[in-house]
């Protein structure tokens, strides 16, 4: 196989032996891939800072002589470092959550071009100091779940299809197992998530219809933002089959009001 040159986002790096790293990255054309970066721990000059988590890089890799082994990473050049994200622990945790989500969900060598573009766009927006980080996170989660075919049903009861507009006020049960909201007339949830208000659900629906520019113009209550975020993060964890480590860290930051 000839060498492949492509843009990628670093999803994970783990130590291998005394000097090497196994680097997992996400590309537009080939999806998630892993490669062996030889001597990456021994010499900083070998790859510089171009193997850091969620960096956008230009990489060159090719299969070695050993059949069935990992491809060898020969070059990694930094394209976008996202420095403003790295100077903010909360933003760093959010970017880490997105990387961990894609690492856990994506299949090897299965192209996901729209998700790749979503990740790049979300990192660029998060790197912008003027943009609300929580809105960027909510939009990422909404778009990711949609592209993964897992969009939550928020406009009507998943059992009787009664429109949200006819529910009145009060708490709303979100059922992870059924993938949407359940009206009071249909009973309890099988796998309940956070309890939401009608207003919080409507704000999520409004956000889902627009882009970041439109979201920036919306005046959203803090409580509704928090409830909507908690819903999407818990729904994501339900479908991943586990709570991502970076999400646990994020929750700890929030508990400490960081």
UniProtKB/Swiss-Prot annotation:
Keyword DNA damage annotated: yes
Gene3D superfamilies linked: Nucleic acid-binding proteins, Recombination protein O, C-terminal domain
Gene Ontology BP annotations: DNA recombination; double-strand break repair
S-adenosyl-L-methionine recorded as keyword: no
Signal sequence residues: none
Domain of life: Bacteria
GO cellular component, one term: bacterial nucleoid
Keywords, ordered alphabetically: DNA damage, DNA recombination, DNA repair
Family annotation (InterPro entries): ARFGAP/RecO (IPR037278), DNA_rep/recomb_RecO_N (IPR022572), NA-bd_OB-fold (IPR012340), RecO (IPR003717), RecO_C (IPR042242)
Similarity field: Belongs to the RecO family.
Function per UniProt: Involved in DNA repair and RecF pathway recombination.
The protein, known as: DNA repair protein RecO
């Amino acid at each position: 196989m000839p060498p492949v040159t492509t843009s990628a986002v670093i999803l994970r790096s783990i130590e291998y032996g005394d000097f090497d790293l196994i680097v997992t990255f996400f590309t537009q054309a080939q999806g998630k891939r892993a490669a062996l970066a030889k001597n990456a721990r021994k010499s900083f000059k070998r790859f510089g800072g171009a193997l850091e988590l969620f960096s956008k890089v230009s990489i060159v890799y090719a299969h070695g002589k050993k059949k069935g082994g990992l491809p060898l990473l020969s070059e990694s050049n930094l394209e976008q470092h996202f420095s403003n994200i790295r100077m903010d622990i909360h933003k760093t945790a959010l970017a880490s959550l997105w990387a961990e989500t894609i690492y856990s969900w994506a299949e090897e060598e299965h192209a996901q071009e729209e998700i790749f573009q979503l990740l790049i766009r979300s990192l660029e927006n998060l790197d912008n100091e003027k943009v609300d980080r929580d809105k960027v996170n909510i939009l990422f989660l909404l778009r990711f779940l949609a592209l993964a075919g897992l969009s939550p049903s928020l406009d009507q009861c998943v059992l009787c299809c009664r429109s949200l507009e006819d529910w009145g006020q009060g708490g709303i049960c979100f059922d992870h197992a059924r993938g949407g909201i359940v009206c009071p007339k249909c009973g309890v949830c099988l796998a309940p998530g956070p309890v939401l208000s009608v207003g919080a659900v409507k704000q999520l629906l409004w956000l889902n219809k627009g882009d970041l520019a439109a979201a920036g113009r919306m005046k959203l209550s803090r409580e509704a933002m928090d409830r909507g975020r908690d819903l999407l993060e818990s729904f994501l964890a339900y479908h991943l089959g586990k709570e991502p480590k970076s999400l646990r860290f994020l929750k700890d930051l929030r508990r400490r009001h960081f």
